[in-house]
Amino acid sequence: MFIGRKSSGAAIDPNAQSFITAAGISNAIEIQAINELVLDLKTFSLWSKMLVVYPFVGGTAQSNSKNLKDTSFGTLSYSTGITHGSLGIKGNGSSYANTGLLSTQVGISQNSAASGVYMQSWAVNQTMAYGHFGNLTMYKGLPAIYPLLNSNLAPTYNPATFDGFMQMSRNNATNLIFKHKNNLATTFVSPSLSLNNSLRLYVCFANNYNGVSDWISFNYYSLGLTETDLVNMEIAVQKFQTTLGRQK
């Protein structure tokens, strides 16, 4: 087992090492990517805001199940039909990874929450990539993305492509910020609602709605993030994906 140093000689961050050990990762490039991600999140003062982070690295059910922020919390369990590989996890439209967590258990609040997903592609319309149906998910229609974050009023975002890093954040009762890749963030009116306390959060499938059959390479939940935070999150995650050779 790889302990203490990465291939470049830089010390491994203790939080990164905890994940590496729990995930059973031994590949030097993957270790480097995880270590740099943790260090970048700390440099950008984002680490303390993160609650659940699934980097989907290592290509196994074990490595893909672990939460980078706390490896003992939110460990994913899988239905049949989930594929694991170098690009992350892939469902079949009805399969899913179950966080075991309700929105009320993640650590977000009604007016302080953020979430994001990194997609290699998003091919099928009228599907949801993660979360749960109703008020915490991203929905792909035609030809738009509809982000829902503690609200049942989904704004409409029209991306140039349906791939890469998509993030949404709420810092108040009125507005939602949406950011796609390195494009400028957009603020929408989307009044907040109380957290859902009955549906668990899934990946590859939004609990109670059609799932995706595309590769998912990252998923996170955090406290509310500012526009600057979303920019920095995109920088850190895109660097992580680039190190792994799966950037979009």
Predicted regions: what is each one?
Residues M1-K248:
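Polar, enzyme-active/binding microenvironments
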